[in-house]
C-alpha cells in the first residue's frame, strides 16, 4: 500500500465529520447520526480565533472529542488485533484500546487540519439490523472521485463507525495486517512499544521513515 493511500485512509475518516453536509442519496439514520457532530467540527475548523496557534491545544482537544463520539475505537481495536485480542489479559486489552484510540485520534486531528476544500456526495446507504454502511465519494478540488464507505454498527443509543474503506482498502484490515506482521516476527510487547512510539511521533508532528504502523 502506498504512503498516499495509507494517509488517505485516515484522511477519509477525518473528512467524514467535516464533509457530511450536502445530500446526494436519501440519508437514513446512520448518516443522520454522523451529522450530529458536524456543526461543532465545522465551527472549530472555521473559527479564526480557535485557529490561532496559541489555541492549538484547545482546537485539537475539540476535534479529538468529536472523533471519540463518532468512532467505536474498542471495536476497531478488537477487529484489528483479531485472534490476538482473546489472548490478552483484561488489563492488556484496556491498555491497547487506549493506545489505538490515542493513535487514531491524533492521526485524525493531524489529517483533519489539512482539510483543503474537498467535497463529498452520497451514493447510498444500507442497513441490516444493527449493521450499516454509508457509501460516499470524496471529490477532490481537481475533480477526482474517491469512493469511501463507512461501516457502522448500533451501540447503546447511537450509530458508531468501526471501519472506513477507501477505494476498497479497509483501515482496520490495514492495521490488522501490520499488527499480525509485528507479532509474528517479534512479540506483542514489541507491538505495544511501537504503538507508544508512534503516538508520540504523531503528537509531535514527526514523520518516521521506515516505521510500521502507518495509517
For the regions a language model picked out, list residue spans one by one:
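Surface-exposed, charged secondary-structure patches
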Residues: 105-146, 198-215
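Early exported N-terminus immediately downstream of N-terminal targeting peptides
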Residues: 29-104
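Bacterial N-terminal signal peptides that target proteins for export
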Residues: 1-12
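Bacterial N-terminal signal peptides
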Residues: 10-20
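Low-complexity, intrinsically disordered terminal/linker segments enriched in charged
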Residues: 166-215
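Boundary at the C-terminal end of the N-terminal hydrophobic targeting segment
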Residues: 24-27
Amino acid at each position: 500500500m502506498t504512503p498516499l493511500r495509507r494517509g488517505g485512509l485516515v484522511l477519509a475518516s477525518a473528512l467524514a465529520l467535516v464533509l457530511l453536509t450536502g445530500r446526494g442519496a436519501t440519508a437514513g439514520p446512520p448518516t443522520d447520526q454522523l451529522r450530529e457532530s458536524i456543526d461543532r467540527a465545522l465551527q472549530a475548523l472555521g473559527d479564526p480565533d480557535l485557529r490561532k496557534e496559541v489555541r492549538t491545544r484547545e482546537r485539537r482537544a475539540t476535534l479529538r472529542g468529536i472523533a471519540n463520539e463518532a468512532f467505536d475505537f474498542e471495536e476497531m481495536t478488537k477487529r484489528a488485533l483479531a485472534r490476538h485480542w482473546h489472548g490478552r489479559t483484561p488489563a492488556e486489552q484496556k491498555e491497547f484500546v487506549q493506545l489505538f484510540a490515542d493513535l487514531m485520534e491524533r492521526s485524525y486531528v493531524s489529517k483533519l487540519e489539512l482539510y483543503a476544500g474537498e467535497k463529498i456526495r452520497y451514493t447510498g446507504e444500507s442497513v441490516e439490523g444493527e449493521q450499516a454502511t454509508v457509501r460516499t465519494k470524496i471529490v477532490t478540488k481537481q475533480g477526482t472521485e474517491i469512493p469511501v464507505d463507512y461501516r457502522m454498527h448500533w451501540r447503546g443509543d447511537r450509530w458508531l463507525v468501526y471501519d472506513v474503506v477507501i477505494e476498497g482498502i479497509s483501515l482496520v484490515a490495514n492495521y490488522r495486517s501490520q499488527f499480525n506482521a509485528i507479532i509474528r516476527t517479534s512479540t506483542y510487547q514489541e507491538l505495544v512499544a511501537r504503538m507508544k512510539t508512534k503516538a508520540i511521533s504523531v503528537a509531535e508532528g514527526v514523520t518516521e521513515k521506515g516505521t510500521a504502523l502507518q495509517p
